[in-house]
Amino acid sequence: MLPQVLGKQRFDELIRFLMGRHRVVGPVAKPVEAVAGGGHSFETIADPSQLDMGYPLTILPPKKYFFPPYETLLSFGRDASGSHVEAPVQACPTAIVGMHPCDVYATWLLDDVFSRDVSDPHYLSRRDRALIIGLDCVKPCDEHAFCQDMGSLYVDTGYDLMLSDLGDRYYVDVGSERGRELVQTSGCFEPAAQDDHEKHAEHVRRKREGFANKISYDTKYLPQILDESYDSLLWDAASRGCFSCGACNLVCPTCYCFDVTDEVAMDLQTGRRRRSWDSCMLKSFAEVAGGENFREHRSARLRHRVFRKGKYMLEMFGKLGCVGCGRCDRHCPAKISILQIYQQLAVTPATATGR
């Protein structure tokens, strides 16, 4: 479908149209008393006025709507009739409005993660019932963002509609059949005219000028550089202040490790199996029976996380696992910067750590 335009005076009308058919989620400003320093969060809205489409970045990525921090996978029990197991897959139609390209890219990667080999019905059922309306960026969120380096600044898949701000209207790229249906049924859009195409070209030009590379080498060489730096002293130095809190994993849009626990009632008659986010930065993450810990030291855990983002996920899924959103840098209490690590890898001698 050819590009469309959405006048900003009709934006609220579109959101209300969506609210009649979906749970609508979008960036909402959080007060300072709710979040230290303030910020934004993807939340379910009750009115279009709650949306802040000028937000820089949310604290948590929108992946929580497809892959919740906690969820029940199944419940089980027994009674006079025998044993029973229920494994309901809960999903409601959801429209996520205002996803930046880095989060769209991350969601596209997670789609691959959860659909390969043994597909995950819980993630995929939510994803299949989701409508993604992206919002293109024209300038970096802040000094921590390096999406240009990681290849997530420009996306051409993973969304249903992508909005580009042209001032009094949005230029709309239609990315799916579901997006086309929304354009046709809502009545809020008009075909883009020549003037709209010209202004969008100017938007793209300003975007290209507004984002500078922050890493001194092409990140296609990152896997090779990591290979050569496995025994570098950098890992000890960079991890020295790490609290092993796992905040970097919790705010990352592409981390997907989880733990599974069975919770049984005191009467042993009922129970449930729960899934929750896990973190490879926690000391217990690689601990196994008998007390052996394959990544006991903070340096080994940090190295694994960086290798995961810059090498392992690329080998498994063909995409870098870091989108350059900068969330981990922003929220690390020890101020450990993965951007600085990427940069230092190219200049730090690969000296053995002995670990």
Predicted regions, residues:
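Extended amphipathic alpha-helical segments enriched in small hydrophobics
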Residues: S239-N249
